[in-house]
């Protein structure tokens, strides 16, 4: 949402000022197309016309990457997650999005997150601790557009219960990609059902989706059952 307008305004792909081909095979998962040390400066230098009239978002957001090459069976869960970049304007978002690999280009095992600034994409984060997540599944390599539209709806504050949303994550796995939206208060059924229904509408997603409490996921892992479904 652009702060200057009291009504919700949609951020769309047509507003992307500099679409680029990010098919650089030499780019490592989770890295910016520029040198990693120059990522922040590269992303904060959109065309001068956009610098003159930035469009602030209602919230600042941080991209996080979980590098599969850094994972090991001995490592604590979440220990390899690292922040990539924080953005607070529409222009900064597009500068970053245009210079990172999209899900179809990430290696198997990679997790890419976009969470509200100062919320870590971990169950242990105090804001996430009592929450849960909605999850959609996609054929391997076919989640790019849905990931983008999820981000646009989320950072553009298109959800009626946007304050309930912590962030979103795309998980790249052998047989499928998964996109999840994490929320704060899993027991608030009205909020969770609203978020799930709107998300399906935004993406025109016709398959059933389920909501799992983080607490259940911690206890039962893959055998955790959906508490809500749409």
From Swiss-Prot:
Binding site for mRNA: 73-78, 105, 123-124, 173-178, 218-222
Similarity remark: Belongs to the eukaryotic initiation factor 4E family.
Impact noted for substituting residue 6 to T: In strain: Sonesta, Polder, Paloma, Laureat, Baby Bop, Hystyle and Midnight. In strain: GN 1140, Black Knight, Amanda, Imuna, Clipper and CY-10 S4, alleles PveIF4E(3) and cyv. In strain: Jolanda, Imuna and Evolutie, allele desc
Cystines in this chain: 128-166
Protein known as: Eukaryotic translation initiation factor 4E-1
Subcellular location field: Nucleus; Cytoplasm
Keywords: Cytoplasm, Disulfide bond, Host-virus interaction, Initiation factor, Nucleus, Plant defense, Protein biosynthesis, RNA-binding, Translation regulation
């Amino acid at each position: 949402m652009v702060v200057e307008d009291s009504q919700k305004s949609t951020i769309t792909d047509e507003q992307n000022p500099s679409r680029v081909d990010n098919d650089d095979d030499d780019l490592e998962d989770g890295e910016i197309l520029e040198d990693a040390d120059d990522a922040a400066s590269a992303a904060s230098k959109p065309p001068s016309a956009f610098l003159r009239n930035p469009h602030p978002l209602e919230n600042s957001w941080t991209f996080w990457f979980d590098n599969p090459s850094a994972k090991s069976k001995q490592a604590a869960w979440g220990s390899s997650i690292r922040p990539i970049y924080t953005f607070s304007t529409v222009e900064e978002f597009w500068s970053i999005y245009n210079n990172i690999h999209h899900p179809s280009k990430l290696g198997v095992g990679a997790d890419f997150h976009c969470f509200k600034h100062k919320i870590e994409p971990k169950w242990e984060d105090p804001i996430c601790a009592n929450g849960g997540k909605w999850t959609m599944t996609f054929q391997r390599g076919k989640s790019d557009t849905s990931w983008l539209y999820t981000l646009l709806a989320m950072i553009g504050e298109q959800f009626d219960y946007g304050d309930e949303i912590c962030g979103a994550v795309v998980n790249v796995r052998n047989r499928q990609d998964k996109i999840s939206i994490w929320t704060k208060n899993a027991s608030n059924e009205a909020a969770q059902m609203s978020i799930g229904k709107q998300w399906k509408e935004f993406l025109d997603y016709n398959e059933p989706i389920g909501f799992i409490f983080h607490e259940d996921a911690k206890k039962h892992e893959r055998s955790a059952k959906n508490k809500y479904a749409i």
